[in-house]
Structure formats: structure tokens, C-alpha cells
């Protein structure tokens, strides 16, 4: 009973409440669009926010998340993963599979998949694989050991 009174008093004083963070209008627009499943509008809103505030890490993360959602929306993850096993050198399929894996929380397999593919190709194909890896890295905390390891492997593969 005493604990409940303390918690009630604390709440009345605003203690323990989450601070309300101000959001940018573009972010509000993006989130509203996402609620409607409108990935194109959400992506455009985040791009406008990044154009206005180029160092906004939350906007960059939001954009990367929206782009991943758009790429994986409606995909049959199990079929893509099956097909990726059957066609290990199909760049489109492997990139799509990596997206599905990241979306499912399987970061290391996704990174390993693209890193393996990276050394098999050069030129435009290699650039495409590298660019997707960098996009996927942007979805994860840069201090995450899985990202740090994959970034090192990427650098070693390219140089």
C-alpha cells in the first residue's frame, strides 16, 4: 500500500513518465504512411527530412527500415530461402534472401551470404552487393559486434 502511494505521488509529480520527444513533421508523415502500408510516401518523407537534416541518424534509420519493409512486403520468405539454397550464385535471389533474413532477425547469415557473393563477382555486380550490405548495416547499431565483424570482412574482400 505504501509503495502504491509512492508511485501515485511520483506519477502526479511527473516522475517516472517517459519524456515526450518532439518529432519532425516529416517523421510524423512517414509513420502515418507506414500505418497505411504506404511505403513510397514514408520513404519520400524520410528523404525530405534527411535533405533538411542530413545528420539525423533517426531519419536515416527510418529510411533504411522503410526501404527494407518495401523490399520484403508480400514476399514468401520460406520459398525465397529455399530458392536461394538451390541458386547460390543468383545475385537477385541472394540479395532478396539477405533482406528476408535481416527482416527475420538473422543478421549474421544475411551478412555472410552477401560477403560470400561479393568475392565471386566484380564490377557493377560487386558494387550492387556491397551497396546492399551497407544498407543492411545501416539497420543495426554500428557498435554491434556482428556489424563490426562483417564490416571488417567487407573491407578485406574489397582491398
Roles of regions detected by a PLM:
Residues 21-52, 79, 83-104:
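Alpha-helical segment of the N-proximal tetratricopeptide repeat
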Residues 60, 94, 128-129, 147:
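Canonical tetratricopeptide repeat
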Residues 65-81, 135-159:
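Alpha-helical linker/edge segments of TPR/alpha-solenoid repeat scaffolds
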Residues 1-15:
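Non-catalytic, surface beta->alpha helical segment in thiol-disulfide oxidoreductase systems
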Residues 47, 81-85, 115, 134, ...:
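Alpha-solenoid helical repeat scaffolds
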Amino acid at each position: 500500500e505504501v509503495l502504491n502511494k509512492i508511485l501515485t505521488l511520483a506519477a502526479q509529480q511527473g516522475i517516472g513518465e517517459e519524456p515526450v520527444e518532439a518529432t519532425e513533421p516529416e517523421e510524423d508523415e512517414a509513420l502515418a504512411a507506414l500505418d497505411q502500408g504506404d511505403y513510397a510516401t514514408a520513404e519520400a518523407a524520410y528523404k525530405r527530412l534527411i535533405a533538411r537534416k542530413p545528420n539525423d541518424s533517426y531519419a536515416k534509420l527510418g529510411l533504411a527500415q522503410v526501404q527494407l519493409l518495401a523490399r520484403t512486403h508480400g514476399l514468401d520468405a520460406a520459398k525465397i530461402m529455399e530458392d536461394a539454397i538451390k541458386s547460390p550464385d543468383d545475385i537477385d535471389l541472394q540479395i532478396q534472401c539477405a533482406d528476408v533474413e535481416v527482416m527475420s532477425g538473422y543478421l549474421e547469415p544475411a551478412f555472410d551470404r552477401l560477403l560470400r557473393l561479393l568475392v565471386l563477382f566484380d564490377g557493377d555486380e560487386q558494387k550492387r552487393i556491397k551497396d546492399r550490405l551497407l544498407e543492411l548495416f545501416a539497420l543495426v547499431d554500428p557498435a554491434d559486434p556482428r556489424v563490426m565483424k562483417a564490416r571488417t570482412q567487407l573491407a578485406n574482400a574489397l582491398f
